[in-house]
Amino acid sequence: MKPLNLVLGLCILVGCFLSCECHRGPRRHDPRGPFPPPPPPHGPGIGRPHPPPFGPGIGRPPPPPFGPGIGRPPPPPPCPPVPPHPRPPSNPSPPPTPSIPPTGPPTTVQATTMPAASISITTPTARDSTDIFWRLWELINSLLQQE
């Protein structure tokens, strides 16, 4: 899986950091000149338009809930006391060493290619990461072919 992750990661990095300039070509002088300034945001005046005045039938908006005549909000409830964390001992004992069972010699396979020659081939019992990757790849391919 590591080579596949590497390839996908590099593709993502190239896509993120590759500027579009190489697809457009080098920048050239624009013969149209600079763009005109944008129009004012709210018509021909300075700033925003004034809010509508309060007419005879419309009252003022209500005051904020905690204004000068109303009391302050209640304080939050106090937090319960937190017990102190226990201190580790000053001289901790070393962790126990795990017992490793003795390993036997690698398995020996006898090859009988010629009757006169006796050749022994030793193979390690540990799996190679490429072998695991290859089996995973075959599994993915077989699942995709079934669909």
Swiss-Prot record:
Entry comment describing in which tissues the protein is expressed: Secreted into saliva by submaxillary gland.
Endpoints of the signal sequence: 1-22
Region 3 X 12 AA tandem repeats of G-P-G-I-G-R-P-[HP]-P-P-P-[PF], residue ranges: 43-78
Sequence repeat placement: 43-54, 55-66, 67-78
Main localization, broad class: secreted
Localization in the cell: Secreted
Listed Pfam families: PROL5-SMR
Residue ranges of the region described as Disordered: 27-128
Superkingdom in the source lineage: Eukaryota
Keyword line: Repeat, Secreted, Signal
An example Gene Ontology CC term for this record: extracellular region
Compositional bias of kind Polar residues: 108-127
UniProt xrefs under InterPro entries: SMR-like
Biased composition (Pro residues): 33-105
Record-annotated disulphide pairs: none
Function noted in UniProt: May play a role in protection or detoxification.
Entry similarity comment: Belongs to the PROL1/PROL3 family.
The protein, known as: Submaxillary gland androgen-regulated protein 3A
Organism in which the protein naturally occurs: Mus musculus (Mouse)
